A protein has these predicted regions:
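Single-stranded nucleic acid-binding surfaces, predominantly the OB-fold ssDNA-binding core
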Residues: 1-111
Length: 111
C-alpha cells in the first residue's frame, strides 16, 4: 500500500521545538496551501490549512531554519488521529507526518 503526500505552502506561524518525556524532538505547525482554482462566488483562490508534525532531526531542522511565511515543501504521509475533546465527544483529525522538508523559496524571497 502507498501513503505518500507532498505539499507546498507557507508556514502560518513560527514552529516551536518541544521534547517528549524521553527527549525526542517534535514540532507541529500548519502550512497554507492555495488551491489551483478560483471560487465562483468570490473569484478568489481558496486556501487549505494543513497540519504537519515533524519528529527528531526533521523537527530540529524546521525549528532552526523556518519561520512564519516561509515557503516549504513537505514530503510525508497522511495520518488520521482519533481523539476526544474536552466534552468527551469523539473527534478525528488529519495531519501530515513529515519525512522531509525543503525550502520552497530562496531565503531572500521568504523574508
Amino acid at each position: 500500500m502507498l501513503n505518500r503526500i507532498v505539499i507546498m505552502g507557507r508556514l502560518t506561524r513560527d514552529p516551536e521545538l518541544r521534547r517528549t518525556q524521553n527527549g525526542t524532538a517534535v514540532t507541529s505547525f500548519s502550512v497554507a496551501v492555495d488551491r489551483d482554482f478560483k471560487s465562483r462566488e468570490s473569484g478568489e483562490k481558496a486556501t487549505d490549512f494543513i497540519d504537519v508534525v515533524a519528529w527528531r532531526q526533521t523537527a530540529e531542522f524546521v525549528c532552526q531554519y523556518f519561520t512564519k511565511g516561509r515557503m516549504a515543501v513537505v514530503e510525508g504521509r497522511l495520518q488520521i488521529r482519533d481523539w476526544k475533546d474536552k466534552d468527551g465527544n469523539n473527534r478525528r483529525s488529519a495531519e501530515v507526518v513529515a519525512d522531509n522538508i525543503y525550502f520552497g523559496d530562496s531565503k531572500r524571497d521568504g523574508q
